A protein has these predicted regions:
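Arg/Lys-rich, low-complexity, intrinsically disordered basic segments
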Residues: 1-110
Length: 110
């Protein structure tokens, strides 16, 4: 008997949870299914803090050759750093943009 390739997932399994990291040296973590990704080094600034566009562009230039910022990189710290910490001047606007850009749902737990 053949199994259907398209399995319906419960709505909660499609949600990515974003919250403060449980690691002392990281700012945030995302939970994607059974994988947890910690990102953003504590003690370092990011675009949501300094809001300096020139610094944001330097960050992008420095990291673009080694990071996967496409949806295929969704389970990497580099993906989340780029789209949450270095995308827009506020965390909430970055979350909204990331959801729209990649067609995902992010639940931010404060």
């Amino acid at each position: 008997m053949k199994r259907s390739k398209s399995r319906s997932l419960s709505p909660s399994s499609n949600v990515i949870t974003l919250k403060k990291s449980s690691k002392k040296d990281k700012k945030f973590m995302v939970i994607i299914g059974n994988k947890t990704v910690h990102f953003g080094a504590v003690g370092y600034s990011d675009f949501t803090i300094h809001k300096d566009i020139d610094r944001m562009h330097r960050y992008e230039t420095r990291h673009k050759s080694r990071e996967d910022w496409k949806k295929s990189g969704i389970k990497t710290a580099g993906f989340w750093s780029k789209w949450i910490l270095w995308n827009k001047p506020s965390l909430i606007s970055s979350i909204r943009d990331t959801q729209k850009r990649f067609g995902i749902r992010i639940k931010y737990v404060r």
